[in-house]
Amino acid sequence: MNLNSIPAFQDNYIWVLTNDEGRCVIVDPGEAAPVLKAIAEHKWMPEAIFLTHHHHDHVGGVKELLQHFPQMTVYGPAETQDKGATHLVGDGDTIRVLGEKFTLFATPGHTLGHVCYFSHPYLFCGDTLFSGGCGRLFEGTPSQMYQSLMKINSLPDDTLICCAHEYTLANIKFALSILPHDSFINEYYRKVKELRVKKQMTLPVILKNERKINLFLRTEDIDLINEINKETILQQPEARFAWLRSKKDTF
């Protein structure tokens, strides 16, 4: 399997997973034009679309792509039924695409019906987890999002996090505003800044490293707890997550 990315809009990535025969699955095509261009250039043969949630920048290109490739199966949660999904999927489902098995798990928070697709080592997590951050809570609660992130955090160390936006630099700046002396985050910031100056992408990221730079995955880390305790004493990891999310919302 080969992982490819297509830039879209200002900071979206549309992921395309291909096999050796050129058959492919397209993840969250927010617009059709760049996908159609890439398909023509690489001579890919689209077999399926994965949708993680219903937001327009993730589903906007589905119907046009289906006009060109009506044989495609479009997998998505119930909230994407009116966005072009032909096969509804949910927590615990498994599907076979490109000869590979993908496991789905519900990750409510950003939206209530958000799902992720996992076939080791690839995790397509939409707007649940970003490198250095997590999605805004447009529909769900902090508790829901925390539990969703813990599902992701339980995956193997070598999982490749394929999130949908290039938010890494801004997220690392936020992390440093909370833990300014964290050596790993500081070093990672320098690397990410250099990549972005060169207009290179920072994704995908390996989960083992993400656990070190993403404060939303470090709610039981003593350094973070000590920093939060300077402002307020929060006993539960979920409460510390909610505190972080509130801080990020106004950062």
Swiss-Prot record:
Zn(2+) 2 binds at D57, H58, D127, H165. Zn(2+) 1 binds at H53, H55, H110, D127. One of its GO terms (biological process) is methylglyoxal catabolic process to D-lactate via S-lactoyl-glutathione. Binds 2 Zn(2+) ions per subunit. InterPro entries: Clx_II_MBL (IPR035680), Glyoxalase_II_hydrolase (IPR050110), HAGH_C (IPR032282), Hydroxyacylglutathione_Hdrlase (IPR017782), Metallo-B-lactamas (IPR001279), RibonucZ/Hydroxyglut_hydro (IPR036866). Signal peptide: none annotated. It comes from the Bacteria. It catalyses: an S-(2-hydroxyacyl)glutathione + H2O = a 2-hydroxy carboxylate + glutathione + H(+). SMART domains: Lactamase_B. Belongs to the metallo-beta-lactamase superfamily. Glyoxalase II family. Thiolesterase that catalyzes the hydrolysis of S-D-lactoyl-glutathione to form glutathione and D-lactic acid. This is Hydroxyacylglutathione hydrolase.
